[in-house]
Amino acid sequence: MGQPANRSVFLLAPNGSHAPDQGDSQERSEAWVVGMGIVMSLIVLAIVFGNVLVITAIARFERLQTVTNYFITSLACADLVMGLAVVPFGASHILMKMWTFGNFWCEFWTSIDVLCVTASIETLCVIAVDRYFAITSPFKYQSLLTKNKARVVILMVWIVSGLTSFLPIQMHWYRATHQEAINCYAKETCCDFFTNQAYAIASSIVSFYLPLVVMVFVYSRVFQVAQRQLQKIDRSEGRFHAQNLSQVEQDGRSGHGHRRSSKFCLKEHKALKTLGIIMGTFTLCWLPFFIVNIVHVIQDNLIPKEVYILLNWVGYVNSAFNPLIYCRSPDFRIAFQELLCLRRSSLKAYGNGYSNNSNSRSDYAGEHSGCHLGQEKDSELLCEDPPGTEDRQGTVPSDSVDSQGRNCSTNDSLL
């Protein structure tokens, strides 16, 4: 997001003015540059490697090409551009203690920075809304959000992000009017992101606070729905254990179906944990920076510049966390293993929808057993029965179980 008044550089190198030996000071300064260079290089590698792996997996394996994963691809693209075009130049700015790429690239680089941050955060918000509809309206979800609609939503996210970034920056609407900012704008080696209050507040609202409010509301609804589902399962378990033993013996599938339903609903715990990780990481990485971003334009001297830039980099690191958070599913893990040549041929791998043929294409195992990809519901939190088809004994609805007794109503593409 740029660096305001970066006269004292982020994570300052040791100051040798008080050291008795200038040679020792130089060595410490060089060691600092090398150490920070290694750390920043690792951050760049983590961002690029993780997001390239996500994009490649979704593009290569049909099993992963779901509506939700369209949004994951958009998120990974934003994070990948961040790792390729933003973080390396930011690292150079810090390590060299000056900007060496000229005024034009300074503003263009800043625009890309704001674009990627905004697109990444707003895509997270869209994913939250996607999960909300998948959980609250599972049997209408596929008609509510088709792949074409998902493409339109992604396009709108990038348009809004572009309007927030390139337009005001390239038109110089963001510029402050005090003398220090004017001097920086005119200097080729200065790329400190001085902004006026209107732009700082408006961009923070669009890029962070509004998506955060939406995410908090959506995920609170998700937790409410999940809690009701768990209560429903508890009630159905009580009815199940109250059944007459002879009735269970007459219908041997009843007990097996109930156990399958209960096991299926244990996925809620994993999904709730994932939602907590998503919210916690998102908030921890970006909330401190955007608070400081508002405070900084209101009271310039209150927040040290080093703190501002450090928090900005904590936000950058979020781009490396996203692949880990959103790719916890078995489908992604198997895809990653196959891409990295780490997967051994096994029945388990085939059972998860990946073949071991020469061209490494994925063959969804369900196609051979009546559980087609197109018939799946893109939700893993579901414990509800279709309207009007609820089993009084708490079993999985018959229309969601294939001929081999497997549940075909969900997919592990996200949670």
Swiss-Prot record:
PROSITE patterns: G_PROTEIN_RECEP_F1_1, G_PROTEIN_RECEP_F1_2
Residues that bear Phosphotyrosine: Y141
A GO CC annotation given for this chain: Golgi apparatus
Classification via Pfam families: 7tm_1
Predominant place of localization: membrane
Domain of life: Eukaryota
UniProt-annotated glycosylation sites, renumbered to this chain: N6, N15
PTMs per UniProt: Palmitoylated; may reduce accessibility of Ser-345 and Ser-346 by anchoring Cys-341 to the plasma membrane. Agonist stimulation promotes depalmitoylation and further allows Ser-345 and Ser-346 phosphorylation. Phosphorylated by PKA and BARK upon agonist stimulation, which mediates homologous desensitization of the receptor. PKA-mediated phosphorylation seems to facilitate phosphorylation by BARK.
MF annotations from Gene Ontology: beta2-adrenergic receptor activity; norepinephrine binding; protein homodimerization activity
Region (Disordered), start-end ranges: 379-415
Residues with lipidation of kind S-palmitoyl cysteine: C265, C341
Disulfide bonds: C106-C191, C184-C190
Extracellular side: 1-34, 96-106, 175-196, 299-305
Gene3D superfamilies: Rhodopsin 7-helix transmembrane proteins
Position of the signal peptide: none
Record-stated family: Belongs to the G-protein coupled receptor 1 family. Adrenergic receptor subfamily. ADRB2 sub-subfamily.
Name of this chain's protein: Beta-2 adrenergic receptor
Organism field: Canis lupus familiaris
Gene that specifies this protein: ADRB2
